[in-house]
């Protein structure tokens, strides 16, 4: 099943196997050609960063063959946010508090803008020696910061890695529920902020929407915002339902404006991944 029908050799000494593997790895690093031998190094744990709500947003999955490189675009969580904190973790759990912090750095100097507008590209690069380099770049200004994480400082032992993998399997259902709750909360909050900006920003609908419709949206948004602040323990289903209730009020008003000359583009619903995860 695991060796394409071939019978594995059970007669080799374990110590010899380690020695053979080390010799092969040395040859690969030195660029020597090895006939009929393929030895692949992989990432022992998933690598990612923390996003809003303490979510572990994965960039490089566990067992990815190295060297490897992966980029993903993120944005800001607050209006006029001047900086983002990049916290790098390894682990398999849904929340970063249950994973292992490898390092962190701050990218500052982000020009004032509404939340979700700045584009921050985060790139993870793992070289053939397992050294991780993380860089964050503000695509608007070109400013960037980074960090290099080596294998000899602050990394987990083999036993700790195995424990993290076992814990991820043990708490898989609990982690799934936690992730769904945080994502549902973020979706509702994003929609609330999007609707507020839409009816108050002159570049969007402020000059096109009727006063009564604007007040209807703002009233529904305030009710949802108050509910969210007073129900921090709400589960994902309650959060999703609250989002649907808010959309039921806002979307017909927005849709009504489509047919007007110079009307707006369609507004996304709260459960769509409009831009990117927020930092």
From Swiss-Prot:
One GO cellular component term noted in the UniProt record for this chain: endoplasmic reticulum
Family affiliation: Belongs to the heat shock protein 70 family.
Activity regulation description: The chaperone activity is regulated by ATP-induced allosteric coupling of the nucleotide-binding (NBD) and substrate-binding (SBD) domains. In the ADP-bound and nucleotide-free (apo) states, the two domains have little interaction. In contrast, in the ATP-bound state the two domains are tightly coupled, which results in drastically accelerated kinetics in both binding and release of polypeptide substrates. J domain-containing co-chaperones stimulate the ATPase activity and are required for efficient substrate recognition.
Motif Prevents secretion from ER: chain residues: 276-279
Quaternary state and interactors: Interacts with PK4; the interaction is disrupted in response to stress.
Name of the gene encoding the protein in the UniProt record: BIP
Source superkingdom: Eukaryota
Organism: Plasmodium falciparum
Protein name: Endoplasmic reticulum chaperone BIP
């Amino acid at each position: 099943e695991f060796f394409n029908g071939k019978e594995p050799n059970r007669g080799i000494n374990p110590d010899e196997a380690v020695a053979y593997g080390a010799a092969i790895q040395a040859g690969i690093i030195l660029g020597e050609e090895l006939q009929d031998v393929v030895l692949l190094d992989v990432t022992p744990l998933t690598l990612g960063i923390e996003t809003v709500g303490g979510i572990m947003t994965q960039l490089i999955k566990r067992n990815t063959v190295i060297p490897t490189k992966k980029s993903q675009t993120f944005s800001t969580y607050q209006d006029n946010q001047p900086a983002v904190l990049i916290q790098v973790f390894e682990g398999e759990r849904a929340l970063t508090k249950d994973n292992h912090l490898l390092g962190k750095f701050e990218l500052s100097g982000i020009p004032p803008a509404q939340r979700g507008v700045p584009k921050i590209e985060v790139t993870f690069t793992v070289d053939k020696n397992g050294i991780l380099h993380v860089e964050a770049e503000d695509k608007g200004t070109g400013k960037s910061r980074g960090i290099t994480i080596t294998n000899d400082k602050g990394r987990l032992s083999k036993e700790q890695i195995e424990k993290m993998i076992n814990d991820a399997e043990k708490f898989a259902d609990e982690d799934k529920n936690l992730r769904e709750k945080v994502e549902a909360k973020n979706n509702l909050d994003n929609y609330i902020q999007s609707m507020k900006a839409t009816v108050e920003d002159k570049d969007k609908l402020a000059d096109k929407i009727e006063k009564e419709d604007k007040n209807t949206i703002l009233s529904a948004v305030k009710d949802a915002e108050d509910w969210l602040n007073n129900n921090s323990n709400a589960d994902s289903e309650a959060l999703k339902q609250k989002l649907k209730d808010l959309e039921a009020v806002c979307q017909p008003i927005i849709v009504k404006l489509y047919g007007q000359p110079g009307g707006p583009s369609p507004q996304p619903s709260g459960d769509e991944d409009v831009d990117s995860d927020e930092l």
